[in-house]
Amino acid sequence: MTTEITTVKCPTCKQAVIWDAASIYRPFCSKRCQLIDLGEWADEEKCIPSDDMVSDSEDWSETR
């Protein structure tokens, strides 16, 4: 029985990453690339697109 090795590209540096339990930072190749990605989300360089327009006004509330 032959098992296929699945590889993905690291979202940060594009290096090939083997997708299995031994790759503890998957889909990233390393802790460094994982932290770079986290920093981009924290700095709002990355975001999930939305049709909702949220303003910073005083009327804004977390409940709808």
Swiss-Prot record:
Q: Which GO terms describe its molecular function?
A: DNA topoisomerase type II (double strand cut, ATP-hydrolyzing) inhibitor activity; zinc ion binding
| UniProt cross-references to InterPro entries, sorted A to Z | DNA_gyrase_inhibitor_YacG (IPR005584), Znf_NHR/GATA (IPR013088)
Required co-factor(s) are:
Zn(2+)
Q: Identify one Pfam family in the record.
A: YacG
Q: How is the cofactor bound?
A: Binds 1 zinc ion.
Q: In its keyword annotation, does this UniProt entry include RNA-binding?
A: no
Listed binding positions for Zn(2+) are: 10, 13, 29, 33
BP terms from Gene Ontology:
regulation of DNA-templated transcription
Q: Does the keyword Cell inner membrane apply?
A: no
Query: Could you list the residue ranges forming a coiled coil in this record?
Result: none
Q: What SUPFAM superfamilies does UniProt report for this protein, alphabetically?
A: Glucocorticoid receptor-like (DNA-binding domain)
Question: Which Cys pairs does UniProt list as disulfide-bonded?
Answer: none
- Alphabetically ordered keywords of this record: Metal-binding, Zinc
Can you state the subunit structure given in the record? Answer: Interacts with GyrB.
Q: What family is this protein classified in?
A: Belongs to the DNA gyrase inhibitor YacG family.
| Function statement | Inhibits all the catalytic activities of DNA gyrase by preventing its interaction with DNA. Acts by binding directly to the C-terminal domain of GyrB, which probably disrupts DNA binding by the gyrase.
What is the designated name of this protein? DNA gyrase inhibitor YacG
Lineage, top ranks: Bacteria, Pseudomonadati, Pseudomonadota, Gammaproteobacteria, Enterobacterales
